[in-house]
């Protein structure tokens, strides 16, 4: 609805994503690319907000594919978003390594048959028990790949 769209726009327009951006994200993604990995950004967030964020933090060129959950009928924990991403990139699900922090994101990747690193985030008390690995920082994934 128009009211919800306006409320969402107002909330997110006030956030300076450069201030909350994880600084190791860019160097980690660049290292993954240097090692020959394909890197996708898969988010439940809407495409306009994803676009704004990756532009603000200067990461758009780093991703081979950017996927929004708004492209699908069902959101996470439905694994469709991850199946679509793997298929689009021509990669088998069991060859994918996903970094997730939320319970529903981890469940979606688990149901898609992907390896999962649960990124620690103490703010929300997410259940990360289905993650294969537990990491404190994005850069920790480099130890596993």
Name every feature range the model reports, one short phrase each.
Residues 13-41, 47, 51:
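Short, acidic loop-to-helix structural element flanking the phosphoryl-transfer center
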């Amino acid at each position: 609805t128009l009211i919800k769209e306006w409320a969402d726009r107002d909330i997110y327009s006030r956030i300076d994503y450069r201030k909350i951006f994880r600084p190791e994200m860019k160097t980690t993604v660049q290292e993954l690319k240097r090692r020959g990995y394909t890197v996708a950004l898969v988010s439940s967030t809407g495409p306009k907000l994803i676009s704004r964020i990756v532009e603000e933090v200067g990461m758009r060129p780093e991703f081979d594919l950017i996927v929004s959950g708004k492209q699908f009928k069902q959101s996470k924990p439905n694994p469709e978003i991850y199946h679509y991403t793997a298929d689009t990139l021509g990669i088998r699900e069991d060859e994918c390594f996903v970094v997730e922090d939320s319970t529903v994101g981890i469940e979606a990747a688990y149901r898609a048959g992907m390896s999962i690193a649960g990124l620690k985030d103490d703010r929300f008390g997410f259940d990360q028990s289905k993650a294969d690995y537990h990491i404190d920082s994005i850069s920790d994934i480099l130890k596993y790949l």
